[in-house]
Amino acid sequence: MSLEHAILGFLNYAPMTGYDLRKAFDTSVRHFWPADQAQIYRTLKELTRRGWVTVEVVPQEDRPNRKVYHLTDAGREELHRWLRAPSDPEDPRVPLLVKVFFAGQLTNEETIALLEGYAAGLRARLEAYARIPQQAAHYAEAVRSPREVFFWALTLDYGVRLTRAALEWAEETIRHIRNLEEES
């Protein structure tokens, strides 16, 4: 996936400012495709150059003009082309697993501490996932499409399942290391 296509997807729902896009990312796809404000504006500039979006300058009193971005027909065609294209499996790189691979060079306590920190992060992620439905409610009302909301829920389910599996692995690995301590 690319940031470009995520932005095209959001603009397909409605015209938005860069700030609106940042809020949309933060309350929806951030957990599997984060983007900061600078990346969003840089990408909007490129999308405008390609003719996939247009920008409407809305004058405001006592504040800078607002730039509202609109999806063009060419941008919609690109979004649909990308949506139909096959997806490659995810990048298999997991930095934690490289550390675990070489953890024989650490004490068991150090490795357990590493894994406990990882597990704590996963628990925090699950808590954040639990808040997503209420955060996304605003966008669900704006889109007014049960079909769209259904697909949003599928991505959340994927994230929850993946995170639970990683947490289960981390907890089981900690148990194995503790058993290794007892056998030594």
Regions found by a protein language model. Give the residues of each.
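Basic helix-turn-helix/winged-helix DNA-binding cores
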Residues: 1-93
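Amphipathic, well-ordered alpha-helical segments in soluble domains
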Residues: 17, 21, 43, 49, ...
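Tryptophan-centric aromatic hotspots in well-structured domains and transmembrane helices
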Residues: 32-33, 101, 152
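Amphipathic alpha-helical dimerization/coiled-coil segments
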Residues: 81-131
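Amphipathic alpha-helical coiled-coil segments and their boundaries
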Residues: 108, 115, 122, 149-152, ...
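Acidic interhelical loop/turn segments
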Residues: 132-154
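Amphipathic alpha-helical coiled-coil segments
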Residues: 160-175
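Long amphipathic alpha-helical coiled-coil segments
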Residues: 172-184
